[in-house]
């Protein structure tokens, strides 16, 4: 398996044909997986906004005041309003905002970015990342696309790449019913391949001002396995989410 960044991409702006810009810069093959950072997808789709686009509601004022009290520094209620509008649920309101997006992703601040946004204050996640992945797939020679983001993980320090949208491949590879090396039947293992591809690509893409937003994964095969598009855990079976709903931050 080989991973390499797509070179020479300029700053992406609203309305840019991202698929064409990728396709003209690299000789893609049909079986390649193209991992595209959500930041450039959002920029091309016009998801850049100013804080003034989000007048603060009473709830946003209260949320920002609480966060400011905990952090010991002022928090902009307009940012809290943007998070509220981009979320279906605020799972935690302190000591930070843990949210569920409309498309099922759970993360901090609804994934809203304030870094590397030259045309505004805020960069929101794509509205429907899998549809974004499908549109990119239609415009490139490769037949598999993953839209990635970075986020933290419970029980571990640091961030890693995750998939928030995909097209042309299943989200997971199902090993259940197959045999291990000792001949025992596997009954549990479902491998989330799109998250693993996103995480591997993030090692190549990097972060900050030296980051490259599009990475090609070559010579990776899904194999002869059953696949599934189950990616975001259903609320009913998400016991951590249910527990966090009942948890209260004690400062």
Swiss-Prot record:
Record-listed a divalent metal cation 2 binding positions: 150, 207
Positions annotated to bind GTP: 9-12, 38-39, 43, 116, 205-212
Pfam families assigned: F420_ligase
Cystine pairs: none
Keywords: GTP-binding, Ligase, Magnesium, Manganese, Metal-binding, Nucleotide-binding, Potassium
Record's cofactor remark: Binds 2 divalent metal cations per subunit. The ions could be magnesium and/or manganese.
Pathway(s) the chain acts in: Cofactor biosynthesis; coenzyme F420 biosynthesis
UniProt cofactor(s): Mg(2+); Mn(2+); K(+)
A single GO BP: F420-0 metabolic process
Signal peptide: none
GO function term, MF aspect, one: metal ion binding
EC numbers on record: 6.3.2.31, 6.3.2.34
Catalysed reactions listed for this entry: oxidized coenzyme F420-0 + GTP + L-glutamate = oxidized coenzyme F420-1 + GDP + phosphate + H(+); oxidized coenzyme F420-1 + GTP + L-glutamate = oxidized coenzyme F420-2 + GDP + phosphate + H(+)
InterPro entries xref list: F420-0_g-glutamyl_ligase, F420-0_gamma-glut_ligase-dom, F420_ligase_CofE_arc
Annotated binding of a divalent metal cation 1, by residue: 113, 149
UniProt subunit comment: Homodimer.
Protein family: Belongs to the CofE family.
Role played: Catalyzes the GTP-dependent successive addition of two or more gamma-linked L-glutamates to the L-lactyl phosphodiester of 7,8-didemethyl-8-hydroxy-5-deazariboflavin (F420-0) to form coenzyme F420-0-glutamyl-glutamate (F420-2) or polyglutamated F420 derivatives.
PANTHER family given in the database record: COENZYME F420:L-GLUTAMATE LIGASE, PTHR47917
Name assigned to this protein: Coenzyme F420:L-glutamate ligase
Species per Swiss-Prot/TrEMBL record: Halorubrum lacusprofundi (strain ATCC 49239 / DSM 5036 / JCM 8891 / ACAM 34)
């Amino acid at each position: 398996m080989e991973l390499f960044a797509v070179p020479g991409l300029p700053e992406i702006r609203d309305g840019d044909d991202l698929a064409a810009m990728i396709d003209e810069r690299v000789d893609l093959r049909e079986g390649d997986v193209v991992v595209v950072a959500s930041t450039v997808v959002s920029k091309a789709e016009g998801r850049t906004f100013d804080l003034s686009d989000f007048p603060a509601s009473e709830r946003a004022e209260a949320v920002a005041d609480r966060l400011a009290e905990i952090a010991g520094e002022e928090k902009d209620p307009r940012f809290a309003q943007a998070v509220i509008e981009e979320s279906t649920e605020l799972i935690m309101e302190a000591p930070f905002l843990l949210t569920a997006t409309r498309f099922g992703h759970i993360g901090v601040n609804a994934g809203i970015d304030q870094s590397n946004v030259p045309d505004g204050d805020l960069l929101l996640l794509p509205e429907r990342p899998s549809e974004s992945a499908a549109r990119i797939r239609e415009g490139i020679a490769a037949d598999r696309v993953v839209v990635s983001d970075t986020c933290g993980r419970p029980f571990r320090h640091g961030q890693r790449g995750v998939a928030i949208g995909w097209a042309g491949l299943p989200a997971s590879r199902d090993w259940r019913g197959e045999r291990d090396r000792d001949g025992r039947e596997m009954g549990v293992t479902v491998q989330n391949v799109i998250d693993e591809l996103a995480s591997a690509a993030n090692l190549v893409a990097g972060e900050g001002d030296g980051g490259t937003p599009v990475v090609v994964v070559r010579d990776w095969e899904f194999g002869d396995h059953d696949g599934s598009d189950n990616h975001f855990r259903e609320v009913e079976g998400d016991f951590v989410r249910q527990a966090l709903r009942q948890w209260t931050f004690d400062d």
